[in-house]
A protein has these predicted regions:
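HotDog/MaoC-like acyl-thioester-processing domains
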Residues: 1-14, 100-140
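A generic structural signal for residues embedded in beta-strands
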Residues: 21, 68, 109-111
Length: 140
């Protein structure tokens, strides 16, 4: 997915507009296990298919794994201010993990520009969600 390059004076015209969704990404057990190792979060619902099955039908991804993936998925179709040298993560608001993401789910990110503030050149806020099944699983 291509990035969209925008002149600073055009940023306001993107408020309320959705960007192209990211590519689909499969959340397989290897990715979940690697995240468990990196974060030292080996709760059985993430890493033990047999124990997790009666509760969720399978293992589920860590909520923070889904959240962490938004960084890379957001880069696929980012809104880039012309002349900027880089972008930084300013933070997230109102993060909610709305539904589990079962192993082997496919997720992607939908981004919508909700506000433009001239705090610093090229700085704006986005609302994003990660969807893998029939409903949004992550809102931030």
């Amino acid at each position: 997915m291509p990035m969209t390059f925008v002149k600073p004076e055009e940023l306001d015209s993107y408020v309320g507009k959705s960007l192209e969704p990211s590519e689909w990404l499969t959340i397989d057990q290897e990715r979940i296990n690697n995240f468990a190792d990196a974060t030292n979060d080996h709760q059985f619902i993430h890493v033990d298919p047999e124990q997790a099955a009666p509760i969720f039908g399978s293992t589920i991804a860590h909520g923070f794994l889904s959240l962490s993936l938004t960084s890379g998925m957001g880069e696929e179709n980012a809104l880039v201010v012309e002349g900027s040298k880089m972008s930084l993560n300013y933070g997230l608001d109102k993060i909610r993990f709305l539904a589990p993401v079962p192993v082997n789910s496919r997720i992607r990110m939908h981004s919508k520009i909700v506000e433009v503030k001239e705090k610093n050149p090229g700085q704006f806020l986005i609302k994003s969600g990660a969807r893998g099944l029939r409903k949004t699983s992550l809102y931030c």
